[in-house]
Every structure is written in structure tokens, then in C-alpha cells.
């Protein structure tokens, strides 16, 4: 919410499987407790979405969550979306099949996608000092090197 461009690789149609962080952490805990040694367990959220769709959902959710009189609303816009050159070898789709972890361990995501986005945004609102720290200095240089100079 700084009014900066929102870089999107390629055409933004790369697909990823999205999972709320607490659900991911719970899956890891359950694998440690109940998983079989040497086995691999895929953790997925059954939420395959295109990157551009995620950005649009985040923008829409921010506008829903910010009060009408909040000055930060002016800094949230789909007009900030900027398409940048795709990375070489960038996978078009990551597909996760979490059937095994559900069958063997009983794990499945509990948080609905939209609720996870809202919780994530709320966390960032509650930790604005942290946000200021990671968007300055070394992190900012990394961001500029990765996205703004493409």
C-alpha cells in the first residue's frame, strides 16, 4: 500500500496452488507426529489460481477491509499492475495432489481461500512496523533488482 507498481511475471496466467500459512504449519506438525519415516507428503490447498487472479483478489479485499475514509485506499488500484518479463524456465503451473496426506494422516486445509487472504491482510495491518522495515534497505534493493530493472 505504497502506491508502487505491482509486478506480474509474463501474462500473469501462471497457476499456483494457494494455502493459508496456518494450514501449512499444521500439515508439517501432523507429518512430524503421524507421518511414516522416509515418506513424502504433498501439502496443497485445492486452490489453484492464476497469479493475476490473486493480485486482483488482494486488491479487492484490501478495498473491502479499508474504511471508506482511509487515505491508503488511494494507493490501492488495479492500475498499478505492471507486467514484467517472465523468468526463464518459469513453470506455467504447479499442481499439488494432497490425497496421500489426507488419506494417511488425516490432514486437509481448514481455512477457506478468501478467509486466508483476509487473515493475511489483517496480519499486515497489525504489523505495519515490520512492513516498513522489510520495504526499506536491503530488501528494497533486492526488490528493485528483481522487478523494477526488467
Predicted regions and their residues:
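C-terminal substrate-binding subdomain of Rossmann-fold SDR/epimerase-dehydratase oxidoreductases
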Residues: 1-150
Amino acid at each position: 500500500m505504497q502506491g508502487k507498481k505491482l509486478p506480474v511475471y509474463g501474462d500473469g496466467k501462471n497457476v499456483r496452488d494457494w494455502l493459508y500459512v496456518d494450514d501449512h504449519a499444521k500439515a508439517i506438525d501432523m507429518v512430524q507426529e503421524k507421518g511414516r519415516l522416509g515418506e513424502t507428503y504433498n501439502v496443497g490447498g485445492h486452490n489453484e489460481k492464476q497469479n493475476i487472479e490473486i493480485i486482483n483478489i488482494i486488491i479487492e479485499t484490501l478495498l473491502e477491509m479499508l474504511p471508506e475514509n482511509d487515505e491508503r485506499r488511494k494507493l490501492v488500484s488495479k492500475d498499478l499492475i505492471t507486467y514484467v518479463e517472465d523468468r526463464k524456465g518459469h513453470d506455467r503451473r504447479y499442481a499439488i495432489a494432497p490425497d496421500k496426506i489426507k488419506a494417511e494422516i488425516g490432514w486437509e486445509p481448514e481455512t477457506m481461500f478468501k478467509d486466508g487472504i483476509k487473515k493475511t491482510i489483517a496480519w499486515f495491518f497489525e504489523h505495519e512496523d515490520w512492513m516498513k522495515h522489510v520495504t526499506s534497505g536491503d530488501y528494497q534493493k533486492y526488490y528493485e533488482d528483481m522487478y523494477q530493472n526488467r
